[in-house]
Every structure is written in structure tokens, then in C-alpha cells.
Amino acid sequence: WNFQMMAANDYIVVAPNRRGLPGFGQEWNEAISGDYGGQCMKDYLSAIDALAKEPFIDENRLGAVGASFGGFSVFWLAGHHEGRFKALIAHDGMFNFESQYLETEEMWFVNWDLGGPFWDKENPVVQWSYANSPHKFVDKWTAPIMVIHGAKDYRICFTQGMQAYNAAVLRGIPAEFLYFPDENHWVLQAQNGILWQRRFYNWLDKYLK
């Protein structure tokens, strides 16, 4: 994610240091675990709302983009942004927590971040986590969304992206699925990186410029 390139393409970049990111200590860094869809989402929205008041910001042409946890964030925000965003891009993000729990290759992360399996009805952290799975808010989606995923991503399988794309299409929302059969959680091959950048900016330019 090249913020300088985004700025060079005439975009103002807002990158909130929300909960879960380094810089404010371990407690801040771990604050997202067990609270997906909670305070960290308020961090995003409070940041964009504050910046939207500035005279150099066009609040009618805002977009949200993210990868990994940021991809999940975009899927979640898609159902909660209340008209703030006019275009979305989600790269390798979790969309359906229940299927994610059973298809990831690394169980430690889903147990730590989501609290455990979705069938544990006695665990309040589990119940909160799965209640905030982005797929449960598709009925509130309105903004055009581009979904990007690599077939060799075993941490967050490409089926998460496919589900999100299909959901958008079935809702009648403009959507695009950029699928890399030879990439994992990252886009590492030069030719794929060029394609990624090209489609990324084409999508944003189409809806925000």
C-alpha cells in the first residue's frame, strides 16, 4: 500500500492508527482481539468524520480500502458506513467468520481473535465476534465494491472473497473480483503487482473522480 502513489494519483490518504496497530503499547495493540466490529471501527469512522469537515476534503467522494484485517474492515464498514463511502476495495479480508473458522490453516488466530468456535454458545466473546461477521450485514450494502484475493492464501482463503463478491452481485451492487491464482496473502510477482495497481486505481477513479 503505497500512500505516496495514492497521493500522486490525487487522493488524500487517511490512515488512522486505530486499535490493533503498533505505537501505543501492547494493550492498544491487542484491543481488537475479541472485539472485531467494535471500538476499532469507531476509530475509523471518527477519523474520517473529523477529516471530512476540512475544506480540502470532498465528503461526497470518499472511499475505503484495506487488506487483511483492513479487508475485513472494508467488508464490515460496507454494512455500517451509512452512506459515507462511494467506493470500496477489500483485499484478502475475512467476510464470513463461521466459514473462516473452519477453513483457515492457522487455528490459533481465529481462536485468539474471535474467541473460539462459533458453536460455543456460552462464551460471550464468541457470541459478540460472530454476531459482527460482515456477511450478516450484506442487506445494508450500498457502495460499489472491488474484491481482491489470491488463490494461495491459506490464512484467509479465496472463498472469503468469492462469497463477498457473490453477495454484492446478488444484491445488485456494482462489484468486481480480481483473482490471482498464483498469489498468496501478498501480491509478490511484478506483473501481478502492475495489474493490481492498474485495477485498484481504475476502480477508485471510476467512482470517486
Regions found by a protein language model. Give the residues of each.
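Active-site-proximal cap/loop segments of hydrolase catalytic domains
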Residues: 1-9, 13-209
